[in-house]
Amino acid sequence: MRVESLKTTLNFIFKYLTLNIPTMNKALSIAAAALIGCASINAEAQTMIGKTTNVAAISKGDRMTPETLWAMGRVGGAAASPDGKTVVYQVGYYSVKQNKSHQMLYTVSADGKLQRTLTTTAASETDAAWIEGGKRIAFLTKGQLWSMNADGTDRRQLTKSDIDIEGFKFSPDGKKVILIKSLPYHESIQKNPDDLPLATGRRITDLNYRHWDHYVESVAHPFVADVTENGVDDGKDIIEGEPFECPMAPFGGVEQLAWSPDSRTIAYTCRK
């Protein structure tokens, strides 16, 4: 939207620009200011939140302060490669100023001597898992499933789902993958009328309307998708039409689903 507004402003300036030098200078100054402003907005949007180099400097003396805690990275999930020589893990960094976080992926050798940063952009990358016998790493970013070499190169987008993917688990033979997606659910909380999309009031019709920190207006379902050379398809909902969630909120994850060794059967946890 800002880019289109900038184009409109520049077109207006140059359309009505005359050969009057003072007018020209003024117009060019306005155009330059607009360009600088747009560049600043883009630069801010791309700011990468990463590791704080000197956490101790943030502390007040030898005290542990809230600022110190926010400056520390928070280690998330970790997975060892099939040969046991490398571990891929996730670390979250936070910016109090921007009020947002950034999840990054790293690898480290089992002896701790060789560490590599895989995430190099401002987009968060999460849920890393080894695939193809340890040759590649699958992960989530911007709601889609991706894969990359173990050194972070050759990144490929595997899915193009209209619904954000929240988790995944590949079958042992690598030919299929479970994708976790949340679907709209309005059995407990009535959907807002079409002419009042921004209404904040809720009409609750069932006691199971909330999970700790969020209202139940969607439920997670597992989809089984085929893995091909062209990527991963949208998959089939294995509990289609059922008003249940799998994994189960508020604490469940992909650990509540498991493939059989022959990749033919899925065991899952669901409250029915």
Go through each PLM region and give its residues.
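Sec-dependent signal peptide recognition
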Residues: 25-33
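Boundary at the C-terminal end of the N-terminal hydrophobic targeting segment
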Residues: 43-45
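Predominantly five- to eight-bladed beta-propeller fold
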Residues: 47-52, 102-103, 179-230, 236-240, ...
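Multi-bladed beta-propeller domains
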Residues: 49-74, 100, 107-124, 131, ...
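Beta-strand-rich domains and repeat architectures in extracellular enzymes and scaffolds
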Residues: 67-103
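Conserved beta-propeller blade repeats
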Residues: 72-87, 120-138, 155, 162-180, ...
